Design a protein with these regions (language model features):
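Sec-dependent N-terminal signal peptides
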Residues: 3-11
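Kelch-like beta-propeller repeat domains
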Residues: 12-304
Length: 304
């Protein structure tokens, strides 16, 4: 499908808010992801302090400020997005091994039985991708596949039928992007073309109803290895890296106005981090405080 042009009027405004610290992760992990199910934050996979892929998974209760370990993933994964559809948590694809091999697995977490179960695999292996949820379906965009080649094809999973189908390709293929769903669209934000020296500020929005992409206002900074979460209808985009440094940037996109604001920076700059919003607050979890392989157990909480 062709990319539809929009009239873009860049605007970057300053925002307010404050950060505080929450209970740290039980162990330092980078390249992990997070999602919210029943007002609790789940994280799974990542790269641990030994530099190896991990299968560990944890659940955080914001009300109690407490982490607990849940069932391990069936296999170690990193750069694996998590997403929730209805009452179900999904872990999508990801990378395995220190050599970053892409995988096609789709797992769901059975909260009642504390176990992970397989579902129909992705049409092709992919990791370092982004996932958004619209109309009860997973929309997977970007990332790289076999041979460390960028993937343009988008894929949509319907839990009701346990089937995947193709969708319009992302106009700017990239890995290490972040994705978030808001107002019926999936926003693909930032990332890079396999090269941390060439980070993107690109924002493209996918509409499942029309199977079309549109370009939106660019992010104020160029970042890959970043995270995003939707809080009060706005998309908060946090962290990231270049080849030699990490970002504390915290920028907020309003889908209703197509405008960005710059919010209070992260207390601990990092990449490969996870983000989730619950209870009117933004939680930023783990990641790497140095470019490349590094890990932190820090959990920072932003209250607008």
């Amino acid at each position: 499908m062709r990319l539809l042009p929009l009239l873009l009027i860049p605007a970057v405004l300053e925002g307010d808010g404050r950060w505080s610290a929450a209970a740290p992760l039980p162990e330092p992990i980078q390249e992990l992801s997070a999602a919210v199910l029943h007002d609790k934050i789940y994280v799974a996979g990542g790269i641990d302090r030994t530099g190896q892929a991990t299968a560990t998974a944890f659940r955080y209760d914001p009300a109690a400020n407490h982490w607990e370990r849940i069932a391990d993933l069936p296999s170690p994964r990193h750069h694996m997005p998590l997403a929730v559809v209805g009452d179900t948590l999904y872990a999508v694809g990801g990378l395995a091994e220190p050599s970053f091999v892409p995988e096609s697995t789709l797992w769901l977490y059975r909260e009642d039985r504390n176990r992970w179960e397989p579902r129909a695999p992705l049409p092709a292996p992919r990791g370092a991708s982004g996932v958004g949820v619209v109309s009860g379906k997973l929309v997977v965009v970007g990332g790289w596949g076999a041979g460390r080649q960028l993937i343009a094809a988008s894929a949509i999973y319907d839990p009701a039928t346990d089937r995947w189908h193709g969708a319009a390709p992302i106009p700017t293929p990239r890995d290490h992007l972040t994705a978030a769903a808001a107002r019926g669209l999936v926003y693909a934000i930032g990332g890079r073309p396999l090269n941390p020296d060439r980070n993107y500020d690109i924002v493209e929005a996918y509409d499942p109803a029309s199977d079309r992409w549109t370009r939106r206002s660019a992010m104020p900074s160029r970042r890959g290895g970043l995270a995003a979460a939707v809080l009060d209808g706005a998309i908060h985009v946090i962290g990231g890296e270049t080849r030699g440094s990490v970002f504390a940037n915290h920028e907020v996109y309003d889908p209703a106005t197509d405008r960005w604001t710059t919010a209070s920076a992260l207390p601990v700059a990092r990449h490969g981090l996870a983000a989730a919003a619950v209870g009117g607050k933004l939680y930023v979890i783990g990641g790497g405080p140095k470019a490349g392989f590094s890990q932190t157990d820090a959990v920072d909480v932003f209250a607008p």
